[in-house]
Structure formats: C-alpha cells, structure tokens
UniProtKB/Swiss-Prot annotation:
InterPro entries: UreD (IPR002669). It comes from Natronomonas pharaonis (strain ATCC 35678 / DSM 2160 / CIP 103997 / JCM 8858 / NBRC 14720 / NCIMB 2260 / Gabara) (Halobacterium pharaonis). This is Urease accessory protein UreD. The lineage of its organism: Archaea, Methanobacteriati, Methanobacteriota, Stenosarchaea group, Halobacteria. Keywords: Chaperone, Cytoplasm, Nickel insertion. Belongs to the UreD family. It is found in: Cytoplasm.
Length: 299
C-alpha cells in the first residue's frame, strides 16, 4: 500500500462510532493476475475479492486483440468514513487488460476519520494495462485519499484515468468536502518516472485560486506511461483531440525520461471532462495499439 500523508494519518487516529477502520465490510480487497500466451486472449490466472468488491468474470468485448476487461463491482452504494479499499493488478509478459468499475465511486459525507482508495498496478515486458474507473464523487465534509502505484517494464504500457467531481455540483456548494488528495507514483526499473498529486483542502486555501482549478469544478487526469513510445508523437496526437472540446481547458505534458505523457482536463460539467479524457485515451490507444477504445457499456 502507498504511503499515507501526515494529514491523513492524523485523520486515521480518530475513532468511529460505527465499525472501525479495516472492520468487516470496510476492508475491500481486489487482487488479479493476468497472463497471455502468444496471440491468444489474455487469461485471468488468479483473482481474490473481499467485500465490498466483487468480480463476476472477464469480458471479451474490447476491440484490441487479446485484451480482456475486468469490471469491478461494489454493491454497497459508495465509500464511507473508515473505509480502506485496495486493488492490486498484475499483467504478466505480453498480457493486455483493462480494469474499470461498474459506475462512479461516491464518497459519502463524514464526521470522522477518512476513506482510502489504493491501487497497485504491475506490468511486465510487452504488457498493456489500463486502469480506467468511473469518476470519483466527493461529497460534503468527506475526506478521501486516492493513491496509485505503478511498476512497469520498459517495453510495457500502463494507462491510468481519473475524474474528480465535487459533490456540490448537485446538492450543495462545490468544494465543501473536507480534504481530497489523489497521488500517482510510477517507476520503471526502480526509476521514478512520474510523481503527480492533486491535493485540495478548502480550509487551507480556496481551490478556485488561479494556481489550482480557477473557475472550474471538475478535474480529469490521464497518465499514459509508455517508455518505448515516441513521446512527442503521443503528445501531439492527444493534444489534437482537444480542438473538438471547447467546454474544457486541457493540457498535455511529457513525463521525465521520455516515459510517456500526463494529461490534465478542467471543466464545469463532469460529462464534458469525462468525454475529453476518453478522447485522449482513445488517441493514446490508436498510437500504442492501433485501435480505439471500447464503447462505454458498463451501465
């Protein structure tokens, strides 16, 4: 599991009136190992789930040859205070896989403690692994820590998408959550190639200042980790897609050591930001796999 920032360590010391942190139903675990032989389909070799996570099986609906989809289900209706959920996915040599969720993740209002959503992604030589969950909706007074750790081989590719939506867009004032922190760290052969964070704590500073999200509400991020790809070509292909998205402001940055690109999208509507992130994902797919993304049929 990724390191926990000091602020969230202090939150974690707060007692809960209901089930404690890591208690029954609050310690969600999902583990999966995938492998592929030659040009055959990618197979799920091993999986383990612990409530509230559930996996019905794999889906073979992706247009990319040999790529299998894991749609992770969570029937509890959202994430509550004290929840600690972790995902670990390993794609062995040559495997191709996409991990998604059945819907958005709703982080409910809190009175104490915090919720932690942690993901560890490992991609072996020539593997292609995508982690593209639904948006994260953070409600009033909620504290949410999201951490993603990536370890990939030089010939592997890993794509990670994230869309943050403040719950105030529907019922109350935007940015009235307590604390939201999302961080990704990626390593290739033990070298740190990407370290990025979105840390929003309205009590310490207005998220709408010009140096943060300005007049926007929704934050979308896409990481395309591809050490052997042409970073300049990849960035240009993604950037060209944003010409068709007038409702958002977006940018593309090259990662250190020519290990890929990161994309940030800002908007006022979650649908606009999600569409732009999906378009950027599609552009990266075309460059890396020669085929576009699948239709969004999770619902």
């Amino acid at each position: 599991m990724s390191a926990v920032p000091d602020a969230f360590q202090r939150y974690g010391a707060e007692s809960l009136a209901q089930a404690p942190a890591f208690g029954p139903g609050k310690d969600g675990v999902f583990e999966a190992t995938l492998a592929r032989t030659g040009d055959r389909d990618t197979r799920l070799l091993r999986d383990y789930t612990k409530v509230p996570y559930h996996l019905t099986g794999t889906l073979d609906t992706d247009p990319a040859p040999g790529l299998t989809t894991l749609c992770l289900q969570e029937p509890t209706g959202g994430v509550a205070q004290g929840d600690r959920h972790s995902i670990t996915v390993t794609a062995r040599e040559g495997a191709r896989a996409r991990v998604t969720t059945q819907s958005a993740t709703k982080v409910h209002s809190m009175q104490a403690n915090y919720a932690h959503l942690d993901a560890t992604l490992e991609a072996g030589p020539d593997a292609h692994l995508e982690y593209v969950p639904g948006p994260t909706i953070v409600n009033e007074d909620a504290r949410c820590l999201q951490t993603v750790a990536v370890d990939l081989a030089p010939s592997a590719t890993v794509v990670v998408a994230d869309v943050f939506v403040p719950g105030g867009l529907s019922a109350h004032e935007p940015f009235d959550f307590d604390h939201y922190h999302s961080r990704l760290e990626a390593r290739c052969e033990e070298r740190l190639v990407c370290a990025d964070a979105v840390d929003l704590h309205p009590a310490d500073g207005d998220p709408r200042d010009p140096a943060t999200v300005a007049d926007y509400d929704v934050v979308g991020t896409l990481y395309v980790l591809a050490p052997e790809a042409d970073t300049e070509v990849l960035a240009e292909a993604i950037h060209a897609r944003f010409d068709a998205h007038d409702a958002v402001t977006a940018g593309v940055s090259a990662l250190p050591y020519e290990s890929g690109v990161s994309v940030r999208v800002l908007g006022t509507r979650s649908a606009d930001v999600t569409d732009a992130v999906r378009d950027a994902w599609d552009a990266s797919r075309q460059e890396l796999l020669g085929v576009g993304i699948p239709a969004d049929r999770r619902y």
